[in-house]
Amino acid sequence: MEKLEVGQLAPDFRLKNSDGVEISLKDLLHKKVVLYFYPKDNTPGCTLEAKDFSALFSEFEKKNAVVVGVSPDNSQSHQKFISQCSLNVILLCDEDKKVANLYKAYGKRMLYGKEHLGIIRSTFIINTQGVLEKCFYNVKAKGHAQKVLESL
């Protein structure tokens, strides 16, 4: 599987948030960006991961970092997910999976013992110059947010 490497310039993007407002990577680079890709809103692993990142929101802020989740869901799905789970992370819509492809976070993965094409749970730490500082691929949701925080 092809992966992005630490030291590379992070691929730029422009995606809509839960309110339908377009946000680019450049818009976020006033802080470090923790960009995490997840398969689907309101599913067990994705909910756990989003809640964990939200619970650590103030700790990420102390480290001058903003947390941004990306999935193929639409704005309405993100709004519902944010509301139901009291999330305080930014969620972006990558409905055509173009950004996931740029970050090598879309491809073959195992699901219930079978190979499927889908989002590969991945997280990237991007510095204020837009350079990848850390790349995590095929992560487990449980405990991941804490691991990312400790990597900052």
UniProtKB/Swiss-Prot annotation:
The gene is bcp. Disulfide bonds join 46-85. Keywords: Antioxidant, Disulfide bond, Oxidoreductase, Peroxidase, Redox-active center. It catalyses: a hydroperoxide + [thioredoxin]-dithiol = an alcohol + [thioredoxin]-disulfide + H2O. Its EC number is 1.11.1.24. The active site is at 46 (cysteine sulfenic acid (-soh) intermediate). One of its GO terms (biological process) is cellular response to oxidative stress. One of its GO terms (molecular function) is thioredoxin peroxidase activity. Monomer. Thiol-specific peroxidase that catalyzes the reduction of hydrogen peroxide and organic hydroperoxides to water and alcohols, respectively. Plays a role in cell protection against oxidative stress by detoxifying peroxides and as sensor of hydrogen peroxide-mediated signaling events. It is an enzyme of class 1 (oxidoreductase). Pfam families: AhpC-TSA. Signal peptide: none annotated. Residues 4-152 form the Thioredoxin domain. This is Putative peroxiredoxin bcp. Belongs to the peroxiredoxin family. BCP/PrxQ subfamily. The active site is a conserved redox-active cysteine residue, the peroxidatic cysteine (C(P)), which makes the nucleophilic attack on the peroxide substrate. The peroxide oxidizes the C(P)-SH to cysteine sulfenic acid (C(P)-SOH), which then reacts with another cysteine residue, the resolving cysteine (C(R)), to form a disulfide bridge. The disulfide is subsequently reduced by an appropriate electron donor to complete the catalytic cycle. In this atypical 2-Cys peroxiredoxin, C(R) is present in the same subunit to form an intramolecular disulfide. One of its GO terms (cellular component) is cytoplasm.
